[in-house]
Amino acid sequence: MFLLLLLFLHLKGLQAGQNPQKTTLQTTVPEKISSPDVETDAEDHMAYLITINETPHFIHLKKQSFITPTAVVYTYDRNDVQHSQPLSALENCNYNGYVAGFPNSIVTLTVCTGLRGIIQFENVSYAIEPVETLSGFVHVIYENTNKHAVIPDLGKNQSYSWFDESDYQFRSNMKKSGFTVLRQRFIMMDIIVDKKLFDYMGSDTEVVLQKVIQIIGFVNTMLSKLKLTVLINSIEIWSKENRIRLSKAVDDLLVQFSIWKHEYRSQHVAYLLAFEEHPASTGALYPGNLCKLEYNAAVALYPKGLSLESFSVIVLQLLSIGMGLTYDTENCHCTGEVCLMTPKAIYSGGVKDFSTCTLDDFKYLSTRQDLRCLQDLPLERKPARRPRRICGNGILEMNEQCDCGTLKNCTHRKCCDPMSCRLKNKATCGSGECCSQDCTVKMNDVVCRKSVDECDFVEYCNGKDPYCVPNTYARNGQYCESGEAFCFEGRCQTADKQCMSMLGKYVRGASFACYEEFNSRGDRFGNCIHNFCAFRNSLCGKLICTWPFKKLVLKANLSVAYAQIRDDLCVAMYKGGRIPKTTKTTYSNPADRDETFVNDGTICGPDMFCLRASCTETRFHMDSSKCDSTRDCNDHGVCNNLQHCHCDIGYNPPFCEEHKGQFGSVDDGHKYHVEDGKSYKQQSHSNLKKNQLQLILYISLPLLVMISAVVIKQSKLSRVCDRERSESDSSTTEDSGSNTNVTSSGGSTSH
């Protein structure tokens, strides 16, 4: 009975999500099994035994990599302050594959927090997800349907006015000769979730993030036949409020989003996922313009009651039309009953595939310049490897409740089992800088990471998490050393400090003449990586120090060259080793530099610092649109590495408004003052309005009194004048009456 109750509650939770029309509810406990692929390559393959409708099915999976190593998710807190978090933890969670014994089947799953995704057979799709209220890896499976969802077509007969077949090359005019074999290509994408969709999906950032990644996973599974993969560059969730004005007209919404996109996400394709209960169309974009920066934006509308599977088809169709593809005609055929580029694909369950028409069109389009933005290789992509859980390494990893270190060196013996990395008894936490020896999370404002430099900030326990908050430090390019140097990656970078670190406390950075002497040589003792340093980059190549001693430099594995420049004995260094054949300057890549090169961030001119052996202006590396110390920090703080204000003592974050005893930032973990749910910025705005009203009252009240006095005075004068005028008129009338009587008498007399 208790199990049934939990399942009922879970079903109600599902109904609050993306698709209330779920049928054939059943439970299963997926069993992880071995297979030849798993035995050969366990890093990239998985296999599960999953029971559906009382029939066991063998599921074979292969890793699906589409989250870039640098991908981030942006969210907003209750003060509307933006926070960013890397998506690297989810990079190796996505898989796709097939059901053994069913040639026309497709499986798309995420596996890091239970199995979530779609199992597609020929005519039916099943969704699977864990029952979080039950232990034992219990999952629920249900058939995906859209019986009551109102799904409009994405076509020219809808309100979607951007779609016009005249904008396209018709298939009949396409040259379909000389096609080459398709090669793997990639599309970099930024994804934005609007506030209404965030609320519709549950108002939980983690849940919404999971669903967005599932959607892109489904899209990539369908795109595999085109050898195309969408890479997630960023996901932004408008959890507080929408950043643009939303319009009922999807065309207007696209224009508004395009303007926002070009200001904040200008480098890649951007999609806005928005909720509309009963939309007139499924989205809008600029057809055939995927690779044009001014037009590579799209809006996908999520109708009420739609499944994630169906919405992924909408996104896929929009993406296809953006590439220049069109809807299938009755002459187009595919391996399954439903082709992807048809309206029917949105509300149909089961496997869907591209038609031969679409494949031919894509092969043709991929040879043209219109799709030049499709990359042959993902930029700076590292080999994706599934993280191995190592209990006892002191790092909290997937499926671990705690990790206090080895059995010998466990930091929280009373709280965490070092063999299983599970919490003991009733422990709240079992490892981390903010976990006490009593197995509870430490209070707010306890220091968990000290500052190591004037550019580095102190971090505090936030009272919620057992681990210290991420490191915060001054933004790159912030002044330090009384304005004589710059902060870079949390350190005040100076040549003096670097020379002392290399050769001892009495050694200092050399003069410009010494740098120019050595770094113009273009050899192993003086260079800017590839060759000699250009004049403007002289201070950014090899580190040159002044040597104050008469004896030679004696340091293991270090070769030194000397030069007497005026009054200074200058030294340049080279770490021993074989010089590569490809270069005479020891290195061919700035990323490979050693400590004998000038550190990035070292000053090289007015408002300029060294970066990758070049002297560059700091303003190019400080995004003032996101954070400006004058505009955003009230001139009582500096911008940190997360683009938020770190306030001086006596000023309250996030906007550095004056408040006794306050300091720091919203990122350093300490408890800053918030009043009535409003930040001090909001409070100051309300105070400003109040002061403005008081000022208006103070000015207008005397003015009203003066005006009233004048009006009263004028009224009195008017009454006096009227009385005098009345008396004058009365006197005149009496005189006229006397004159009349005399005349009449006279008249009588004359008769």
UniProtKB/Swiss-Prot annotation:
UniProt KW Membrane keyword? yes
Chain segments carrying region Disordered? 722-751
Q: Which GO terms describe its molecular function?
A: metalloendopeptidase activity
Keyword Transmembrane helix set for record:
yes
Instruction: Quote the subcellular location field of this record.
Output: Membrane
| Keyword annotations from UniProtKB, A to Z | Disulfide bond, EGF-like domain, Membrane, Signal, Transmembrane, Transmembrane helix
Which InterPro entries does the annotation name?
ADAM_Cys-rich (IPR006586), Disintegrin_CS (IPR018358), Disintegrin_dom (IPR001762), Disintegrin_dom_sf (IPR036436), EGF-like_dom (IPR000742), MetalloPept_cat_dom_sf (IPR024079), Peptidase_M12B (IPR001590), Peptidase_M12B_N (IPR002870)
Q: How does it sit in the membrane?
A: Single-pass type I membrane protein
According to the UniProt topology, which residue ranges lie Extracellular? 17-691
Matching entries from Pfam families are given as: ADAM_CR (PF08516), Disintegrin (PF00200), Pep_M12B_propep (PF01562), Reprolysin (PF01421)
Q: Which domain of life is it from?
A: Eukaryota
Role: This is a non catalytic metalloprotease-like protein. May play a role in sperm-egg fusion.
Return the PANTHER family for the record.
Answer: ADAM A DISINTEGRIN AND METALLOPROTEASE DOMAIN (PTHR11905), DISINTEGRIN AND METALLOPROTEINASE DOMAIN-CONTAINING PROTEIN 5 (PTHR11905:SF28)
Q: What is the name attached to this protein's record?
A: Disintegrin and metalloproteinase domain-containing protein 5
